[in-house]
Amino acid sequence: MMGHRPVLVLSQNTKRESGRKVQSGNINAAKTIADIIRTCLGPKSMMKMLLDPMGGIVMTNDGNAILREIQVQHPAAKSMIEISRTQDEEVGGGTTSVIILAGEMLSVAEHFLEQQMHPTVVISAYRKALDDMISTLKKISIPVDINDSDMMLNIINSSITTKAISRWSSLACNIALDAVKTVQFEENGRKEIDIKKYAKVEKIPGGIIEDSCVLRGVMINKDVTHPRMRRYIKNPRIVLLDSSLEYKKGESQTDIEITREEDFTRILQMEEEYIQQLCEDIIQLKPDVVITEKGISDLAQHYLMRANITAIRRVRKTDNNRIARACGARIVSRPEELREDDVGTGAGLLEIKKIGDEYFTFITECKDPKACTILLRGASKEILSEVERNLQDAMQVCRNVLLDPQLVPGGGASEMAVAHALTEKSKAMTGVEQWPYRAVAQALEVIPRTLIQNCGASTIRLLTSLRAKHTQENCETWGVNGETGTLVDVKELGIWEPLAVKLQTYKTAVETAVLLLRIDDIVSGHKKKGDDQSRQGGAPDAGQE
């Protein structure tokens, strides 16, 4: 028989936690993350100021932006941060609510785990609750007419009121709606709204926010390559290239042996002829503007300038795609294959302006632009990046409504309605599952509660009366007025949220809670500093452990 030596299965420098300790650790981590962000919900939300590792400052109240900047160690906290990113990419809104909800779902589950209830029971109750939440949401949702621009502006406005941009809300709403309507693109009955690719936000410090606008076209941060080229062209013919107008060196390395000096001049001549040929291929089509993603040599500039063609070089690929969508040009890879229908004639004006101390090329007044640039002006970089984030959210909200025109009441009203429906359903349930199921209803109330807290009103009194209100008939739209902290019918205030955002918020929050409840063991391998040295001479060592 072996002595009582402990058997080491895991190597010594790994840390292992298991059982209840892990679950409460995960729940606490999730609660901590939720607490950081709790004050960022609603119109009376606070801003957070973060220093990034480079020493720059980020000022924001956008849930996702805050969590992106925070460095966390706990694995559960990392997955919480991940869900806000998913939410942001998927629907663009609800990044703050999803974290608060997930944190609350876990926090109500802690009580059951302490009573030795098995996590699986809690999980199956949560899953049931999620299905009922989704069906209740769909019941209280109302359809919306996407051509009614007042209604659309109202929806975007309720997403913007919680942001820093709320002072210029009508301007921001119009910008967002305009931009999204521009990039909307229907093909064989399939709607495509790609904000990321085709609605670019360009920030130029200086001026005031009221100067911001949506351009019917594209703006790029470039100047002409030669000072004597035209800087103002009406109805330009635009050619887009993604090849360079320079002498092309071969792919493989080549050596040339020169015996006579005429050969040397001949080689130079060949280079010139090649470039001249390239330029002639382009000049044949009589374009006014040539825009390329690569370089343009001095000689090519000279030929183009003599033909009175404006050239712009080293444009980003994404910008080039946008110009193509805006003016109807095709991007060509080989100048010798240029055809008449590759030329873009959809733009009404090309002009190059100097703003501040940089030159910008504007391609505007497009006939039917399918891409646009949003020009933002403002006092400082920090303000501009916050406004940009807010605008992105507004555009996402607008996109969601256009793709799925269903709305649910905002201001905590839909949470209360769903919570009420769940509480009613749980009365008919028997067995252990009814308690966690009812707890989900309780967890949902965190949204209206936080809204009340952020206004500084009395939470208990208002929540009780809101609960009472929801037990009455036809009161599904009663919620909290985030400005004053009083109870209102949000239908009259016009606070609506897209159904898609709410559904995603609930799904993500419950899924995350379920995911973290499933974990009962964390093994973290720590790398010791001396680890690398012991690797080389560490073979005999390993046998002794």
UniProtKB/Swiss-Prot annotation:
Binding site for ADP: G42, G94, T95, T96, S97, T162, K163, G411, G482, E483, E497, K502
GO molecular function, one term: ATP-dependent protein folding chaperone
Group of enzyme by EC: hydrolase
Record carries keyword Zinc: no
Biological processes per GO annotation: positive regulation of telomere maintenance via telomerase; protein stabilization
EC number: 3.6.1.-
Localization terms from the record: Cytoplasm
Top-level taxon in the UniProt lineage: Eukaryota
UniProt entry keywords in alphabetical sequence: Acetylation, ATP-binding, Chaperone, Cytoplasm, Disulfide bond, Hydrolase, Isopeptide bond, Nucleotide-binding, Phosphoprotein, Ubl conjugation
Modification type Phosphothreonine: residues: T430, T459
Residue numbers binding ATP: G42, G94, T95, T96, G411, G482, E497
PTM sites of type Phosphotyrosine: Y247
Phosphoserine found at: S11, S170, S243, S244, S252
Residues bearing PTM N-acetylmethionine: M1
Function: Component of the chaperonin-containing T-complex (TRiC), a molecular chaperone complex that assists the folding of actin, tubulin and other proteins upon ATP hydrolysis. The TRiC complex mediates the folding of WRAP53/TCAB1, thereby regulating telomere maintenance. As part of the TRiC complex may play a role in the assembly of BBSome, a complex involved in ciliogenesis regulating transports vesicles to the cilia.
Family: Belongs to the TCP-1 chaperonin family.
Protein name: T-complex protein 1 subunit gamma
Organism: Macaca fascicularis (Crab-eating macaque)
